[in-house]
């Protein structure tokens, strides 16, 4: 195709579509992190602000205006020969398929593609009389970096029969060559082997769209039940052939020759698969591989956008990596090429997606800097034929000039005179048309005048002079163009003057009549305002009688004038008198007509009076009804007062009960406030930790950006410069590793904060549901601990808890947005650093070997430390198992001792005949020498196997919490040495802040261990002989 460039380049238009929060996000307690500036296409997220061409959704423009503002100009450009592209970009689950309309559900009817199809065929219907159209469509997808045809019947049937468990996965047909991407000699990207279907109606095109949408690869993930697993491109090709008249005054010939102009334009409607993270989507196996390919293609697209959006790189002619993926290869014309492109960035406003939303907005902002070069695509064959035809016409004109012997100057003068004559002819034709348009008005006025005279006077007398005047007026229509004599002009002027006077007189009479009627109406209105029925009736009767009398007198005068006209002679004086009488007669007839109108108006006024009387009667009835209602209302007020007195008495009784419940709820409120305070402290601590990690990451990234490594000149020597260079390399490597660790730390804090926020949101949802059940008077569902705990709270406590949770959710949301912003910047800089090459600053093989040796030494040292930690962990696990075993044995011995003690108490009581309580005191006295009864504030023997609280597993025991001894700070040798020393006490102190056993509750103090456990192994050994000797002494 031959291209005709426009005068200026055009940039890529970018629109942002913000979808609302979905159900899962609301359940998780997600908050809106995207703010739209009122009245401006500007979006804010955290501390970042972006300006685009259009913003839809949220508080921006409604989504229904998206087609008219974004896609409609591109559809109009198709008929002018311009290529166009609409590109939907964004995170998975952000609404790209819904926006484009490539889904197979009913909701897709509101998308861009169905509206484009409707507008396309609507405009074709209006232009098909002048232009011949041919429409072709193709629908392809890029699935796992393979281009597959969605409109190929063989491929679709194969996918329907062989596909199981993977919705819409298109299978490759054996023996058919795969679709190849080709580039023509003029740089146009084409697909070899794809199916192009010719369509002529909207129904056929919609069927192709539905067929491809059903065959498209989709799958279910944790973020989207029907996630697109491929990039889809729906292409509409519009071919049109126009016939243009080549006749012009310059060639001097009007032979009716036509030229044919052939235009071909393409509209690419692209629905990209969304970027995704494996942890969020929960994909594995095939889904994970698909996600890898999707992210790979989107990464290549992002690199292309970054390269084209960087003005410095564009001016320097930097390489644009179109060939890194098949997606960017197919979109080569759409990004920086021959196309008018609109990019729709679909984003999610949820704070849990803040990182992906920020990345999408950054790429969309870069895309606005891309400059495309759209051109009109014409057929080169038709263009060449047009040039040849123009050349033939020029040669024929030259040949005629040479054979005729006329000079070029004379021909040019003749052409200019032809143009001037044509212009003059057009002016004359326009004036002629104006005069002809004025003639029907004159004829109409003359006809009305003739009709009046014919009805009144001219029926009996038709003077010859009047006939001559009429004939002269009728003949004055044509002299405007043809006649040039002075008589015709005079007749025309007289007719116009006569017409003007006639119109002026009629208008004066009408104005006078209007003024008179206005005065009468005003006087009647004044009378009607303070009317008396009898006086008004008398007034109207008198008016009607006056009108009848006046009508009768006018009729008599008219009859008299008609009689006089009939008796008059036909001479000149009689003719003048007849004209005067005719005018008087006409005035009288007008007066009669006016009187008739007055009579009708009086009748109407009488009718209105009757209506007003009826309205007065209705008003009186309504007044009586209102009075009756007033009596009933007073009776009801008395009843309501009595009922209120009874209700107030009952409420006072209830108030006493509520005060009792209020004291109970006050206690619950204090308890809930303590719980809220503890949760706030935990949330604040975690938020501060996340903020510190984010701050460290930001400082490291700024240090990397602002302090690049300075290379020394002498890197080959072994002097001071070489040592300095080696140390700088080591510092640089340590810094890079620290940056990666901090990024991992921030991401870990981000995920942990997300889990905390999800727990808070779940509790908030439960409290709101319980509150709704309470309002409706229903009982919450049973069997759920969350509902049971929430139901036990009072309404005021629930409201206070809900408010507290909402505040904590806002704090958590702000923290998530801040961390997402830092993670986005870290990933962006890391990606830019990776693209430039992490190891480009290594200038020699010696530097690389030194850095590799340093990395090897660091790795070996880290492995050794890791082995030592593993050994310590294993020893701690063994020690923990031993402690648990000893604890269980001690518990069994304690139970056996208690059982034996009870038996001996019963035996002593039976022998002595005393109550069991006194024997219990004797048994307690026998156990006093036990070292376990020593006050805990002074000393406490360390007995392996004795611990408080519930025994936890090894993983919980080894949790690196502040309440526990950090790993590596307590030597296992010291513990083993303590276990081997017999008889030596292990003293616990109140000021000791590190314990080998973690205590679950605050009231569990290690120095009160002797108060919880009353018996030990030594106590049992010492108490057994004394208990055995006691019965012997008694005997």
Swiss-Prot record:
GO cellular component: cortical microtubule; cytoplasm
Knockout consequences: Reduced length of roots and inflorescence stems. Altered orientation of cellulose microfibrils in fiber walls leading to dramatic reduction in fiber mechanical strength. No apparent alteration in cell wall composition. Lower expansion rate of the inflorescence stem along with the reduced thickness of both primary and secondary cell walls leading to mechanically weaker stems.
Major subcellular location class: cytoplasm
Subcellular location: Cytoplasm; Cytoplasm, Cytoskeleton
Signal sequence range: none
GO MF term list: ATP binding; microtubule binding; microtubule motor activity; plus-end-directed microtubule motor activity
Keywords: ATP-binding, Cell wall biogenesis/degradation, Coiled coil, Cytoplasm, Cytoskeleton, Microtubule, Motor protein, Nucleotide-binding, Transport
PANTHER family assigned: CHROMOSOME-ASSOCIATED KINESIN KIF4A-RELATED
Protein family (similarity comment): Belongs to the TRAFAC class myosin-kinesin ATPase superfamily. Kinesin family. KIN-4 subfamily.
Protein name in the entry: Kinesin-like protein KIN-4A
Organism: Arabidopsis thaliana (Mouse-ear cress)
């Amino acid at each position: 195709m031959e291209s005709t460039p426009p005068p200026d380049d055009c940039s890529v238009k970018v629109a942002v579509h913000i979808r609302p929060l979905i159900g899962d996000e609301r359940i998780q307690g997600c908050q809106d992190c995207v703010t739209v500036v009122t009245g401006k296409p500007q979006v804010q997220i955290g501390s970042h602000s972006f300006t685009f061409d259009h913003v839809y959704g949220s508080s921006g423009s409604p989504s229904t205006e998206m087609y008219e503002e974004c896609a409609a100009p591109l559809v109009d450009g198709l008929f002018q020969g311009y290529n166009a592209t609409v590109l939907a970009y964004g995170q998975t689950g952000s609404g790209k398929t819904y926006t484009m309309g490539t889904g197979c559900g009913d909701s897709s009817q509101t998308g861009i593609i169905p509206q484009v199809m409707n507008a396309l065929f609507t405009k074709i219907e209006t232009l098909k009389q002048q232009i011949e159209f041919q429409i072709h469509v193709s629908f392809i997808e890029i699935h796992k970096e393979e281009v597959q045809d969605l409109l190929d019947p063989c491929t679709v049937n194969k996918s329907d029969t062989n596909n199981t468990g993977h919705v819409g996965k298109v299978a490759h047909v054996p023996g058919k060559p795969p679709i190849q991407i080709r580039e023509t000699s003029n740089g146009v990207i084409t697909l070899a082997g794809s199916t192009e279907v010719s369509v002529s109606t909207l129904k056929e095109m919609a069927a192709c769209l539905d067929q491809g949408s059903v065959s498209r690869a989709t799958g279910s993930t944790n973020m989207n039940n029907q996630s697109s697993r491929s990039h889809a491109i729906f292409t509409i090709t519009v071919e049109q052939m126009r016939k243009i008249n080549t006749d012009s005054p310059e060639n001097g010939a009007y032979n009716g020759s036509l030229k044919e102009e052939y235009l071909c334009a393409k509209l690419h409607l692209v629905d990209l698969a969304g970027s995704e993270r494996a942890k969020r989507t929960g994909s594995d196996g095939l889904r994970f591989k698909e996600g890898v390919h999707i992210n790979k293609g989107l990464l290549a697209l992002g690199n292309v956008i970054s390269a084209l959006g960087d003005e410095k790189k564009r001016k320097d002619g930097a390489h644009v990596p179109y060939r890194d993926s098949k997606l960017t290869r197919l979109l080569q014309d759409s990004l920086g090429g021959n196309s008018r492109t609109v990019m729709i960035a679909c984003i999610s406003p949820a704070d849990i997606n803040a990182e992906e939303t920020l990345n999408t907005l950054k790429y969309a902002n870069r895309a606005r800097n891309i400059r495309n070069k759209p051109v009109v695509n014409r057929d080169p064959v038709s263009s060449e034929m047009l040039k040849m035809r123009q050349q033939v016409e020029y040669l024929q004109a030259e040949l005629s000039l040479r054979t005729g012997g006329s000079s070029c100057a004379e021909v040019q003068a003749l052409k200019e005179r032809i143009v001037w004559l044509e212009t003059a002819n057009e002016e004359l034709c326009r004036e002629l048309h104006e005069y002809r348009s004025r003639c029907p008005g004159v004829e109409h006025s003359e006809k009305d005048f003739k009709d009046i005279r014919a009805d009144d006077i001219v029926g009996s007398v038709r003077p010859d002079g009047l006939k001559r005047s009429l004939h002269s007026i009728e003949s004055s229509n044509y002299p405007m163009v043809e006649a040039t004599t002075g008589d015709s002009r005079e007749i025309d002027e007289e007719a116009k003057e006569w017409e003007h006077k006639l119109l002026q007189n009629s208008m004066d009479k009408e104005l006078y009549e209007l003024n008179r009627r206005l005065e009468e109406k005003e006087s009647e209105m004044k009378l009607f305002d303070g009317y008396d029925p009898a006086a008004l009736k008398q007034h109207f009767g008198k008016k009607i009688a006056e009108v009848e009398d006046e009508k009768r007198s006018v009729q008599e005068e008219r009859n008299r004038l008609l009689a006089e006209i009939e008796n008059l002679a036909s001479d000149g004086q009689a003719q003048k008198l007849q004209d005067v009488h005719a005018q008087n007669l006409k005035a009288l007839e007008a007066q009669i007509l006016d009187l008739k109108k007055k009579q009708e108006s009086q009748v109407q006024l009488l009718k209105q009076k009757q209506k007003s009387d009826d309205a007065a009667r209705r008003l009186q009835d309504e007044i009586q009804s209102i009075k009756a209602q007033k009596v009933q209302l007073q009776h009801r007020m008395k009843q309501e007062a009595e009922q209120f007195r009874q209700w107030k008495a009952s409420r006072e009784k209830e108030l006493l009960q509520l005060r009792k419940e209020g004291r109970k709820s006050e206690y619950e409120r204090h308890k809930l406030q303590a719980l809220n305070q503890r949760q706030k402290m935990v949330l604040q601590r975690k938020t501060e930790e996340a903020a510190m990690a984010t701050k460290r990451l930001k400082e490291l990234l700024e240090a990397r950006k602002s302090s690049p490594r300075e290379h020394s000149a002498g890197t080959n020597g072994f002097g001071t410069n070489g040592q300095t260079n080696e140390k700088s390399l080591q510092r640089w490597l340590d810094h890079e590793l620290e940056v990666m660790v901090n990024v991992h730390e921030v991401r870990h804090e981000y995920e942990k904060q997300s889990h905390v926020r999800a727990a808070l949101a779940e509790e908030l949802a439960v409290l709101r549901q319980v509150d709704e059940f309470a309002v409706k008077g229903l009982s919450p569902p049973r069997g759920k601990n969350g509902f049971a705990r929430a139901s036990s709270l009072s309404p005021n406590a629930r409201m206070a808890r809900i408010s507290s949770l909402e505040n904590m959710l806002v704090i958590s949301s702000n923290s998530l947005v801040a961390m997402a912003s830092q993670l986005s910047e870290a990933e962006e800089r890391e990606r830019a650093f990776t693209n430039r090459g992490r190891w480009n600053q290594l200038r020699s093989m010696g530097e690389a070997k030194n850095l590799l040796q340093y990395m090897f030494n660091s790795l070996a040292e880290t492995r050794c430390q890791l082995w030592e930690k593993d050994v310590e962990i294993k020893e701690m696990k063994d020690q923990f198992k031993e402690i648990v075993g000893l604890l269980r044995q001690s518990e069994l011995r304690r139970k056996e001792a208690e059982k034996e003690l009870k038996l001996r108490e019963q035996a002593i009581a039976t022998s002595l005949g005393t109550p069991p309580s006194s024997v219990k005191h004797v048994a307690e006295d026998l156990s006093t020498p036990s070292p376990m009864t020593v006050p805990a504030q002074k000393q406490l023997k360390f007995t392996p196997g004795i611990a408080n609280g519930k025994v936890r597993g090894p993983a919980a025991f080894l949790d690196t919490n502040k309440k526990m001894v950090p790993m590596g700070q307590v030597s296992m040798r010291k513990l083993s040495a303590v276990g081997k020393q017999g008889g030596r006490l292990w003293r616990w102190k109140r000021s000791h802040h590190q314990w080998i056993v973690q205590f679950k509750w605050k009231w569990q103090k290690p120095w009160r261990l002797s108060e919880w456990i009353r018996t030990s192994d030594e106590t049992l050994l010492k108490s057994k002989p004394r208990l055995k000797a006691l019965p012997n002494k008694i005997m």
